[in-house]
Amino acid sequence: MAPVHVLCCVSVLLATFYLTPTESAGSLVSYTPNSCCYGFQQHPPPVQILKEWYPTSPACPKPGVILLTKRGRQICADPSKNWVRQLMQRLPAIA
């Protein structure tokens, strides 16, 4: 049986990857339009912290929008929500 600290580290890593938008190729840090969202932010973040956005890949199981903050954080949002569409109009899109 593996030591408890190893199991804890593995659990933390798995949770981190599950909650981060996934990339179909490349680094998690790069902002390529190949990411998928498996859960969505329920409430709008303050527009002051946001920088830009890009859509998820059409190959993803759910359509989504990834909002990028000025600090580099990625937030998954549901493009069918009114607040998300309003942010998409206000913020520049990544081509």
UniProtKB/Swiss-Prot annotation:
Cited InterPro entries: Chemokine_b/g/d (IPR039809), Chemokine_IL8-like_dom (IPR001811), Interleukin_8-like_sf (IPR036048)
Signal peptide: 1-24
Gene: K6
Pfam families xrefs: IL8
CDD domains reported for this sequence: Chemokine_CC
GO process annotations (BP): antimicrobial humoral immune response mediated by antimicrobial peptide; chemokine-mediated signaling pathway; positive regulation of cell migration
Organism, scientific name: Human herpesvirus 8 type P (isolate GK18) (HHV-8)
Keywords per UniProt: Signal
Transcription regulation listed as a keyword: no
The keyword Signal appears for this protein: yes
Organism taxonomic ancestry: Viruses, Duplodnaviria, Heunggongvirae, Peploviricota, Herviviricetes
GO MF, one annotated term: chemokine activity
Coiled-coil annotated spans: none
SUPFAM superfamilies, per database record: Interleukin 8-like chemokines
Name this protein carries in UniProt: Protein K6
GO cellular component: extracellular space
